[in-house]
From Swiss-Prot:
This is Ribonuclease BN. It comes from the Bacteria. The active site is at D68 (proton acceptor). Zn(2+) 1 binds at H64, H66, H141, D212. Transmembrane segments: none annotated. It comes from Shigella boydii serotype 18 (strain CDC 3083-94 / BS512). Binds 2 Zn(2+) ions. The lineage of its organism: Bacteria, Pseudomonadati, Pseudomonadota, Gammaproteobacteria, Enterobacterales. Keywords: Endonuclease, Exonuclease, Hydrolase, Metal-binding, Nuclease, tRNA processing, Zinc. GO terms for molecular function: 3'-tRNA processing endoribonuclease activity; exonuclease activity; zinc ion binding.
Amino acid sequence: MELIFLGTSAGVPTRTRNVTAILLNLQHPTQSGLWLFDCGEGTQHQLLHTAFNPGKLDKIFISHLHGDHLFGLPGLLCSRSMSGIIQPLTIYGPQGIREFVETALRISGSWTDYPLEIVEIGAGEILDDGLRKVTAYPLEHPLECYGYRIEEHDKPGALNAQALKAAGVPPGPLFQELKAGKTIMLEDGRQINGADYLAAPVPGKALAIFGDTGPCDAALDLAKGVDVMVHEATLDITMEAKANSRGHSSTRQAATLAREAGVGKLIITHVSSRYDDKGCQHLLRECRSIFPATELANDFTVFNV
């Protein structure tokens, strides 16, 4: 999996940062997939500065209905139609997302020439496509807001081909059945159980993408043990009370959560427009003083998961 940050500013855009949007490139050999998390104003323009085609976009996850996470959605949906894209698209989001999209399209006389499904979610598992599952967790914000935990299913362990050959199993289609954990019967009547020749499963990757939030009970469960946690760091330590009063988090709170949850890497984003490049580096240093494995997302920064 690969994360591409299209917008990293909180509330309003700046000269160097657009408002929130994150691409997740799933990079699976047998299944293409491009997911978008939040869609602030100007997201489709940001997308033009990447190598990704909107036609590959098949799922959009909206954390909440504040404009800096949402106002780019109608334009992206319409441009997708005007480009002749016919691939289906599914939008997941809190209550009200359906009304917002349908109203924007209706009032502007717009439509989509592709199947568009809108799923209004609550807390819990919202998707399992056979390769990975997505679970929504409620966060602490003035509007209904969710964070998303994306977990790949474990992959089968490697097949011990050498041991199978030694047991008289010819390479070919039988290996595929054994790789799937099935039991086969050889011509001499022997039964071979694939599970006996498989290494331990390879754990799938896990990723937590937070929407806007102050400290909350669900945060630890959302982030527990993930390889990468994406979390807002809207304000620095000295402005923590102000951040919390508006449903946001400070650098200290983001980094402390990462440490307590045992995550592999913390990526901070959604930084206040009050911070210039020097100020953003200060935010990064504050986080690293608590959780050293912290990175700062800038627009168009790419991270592997």
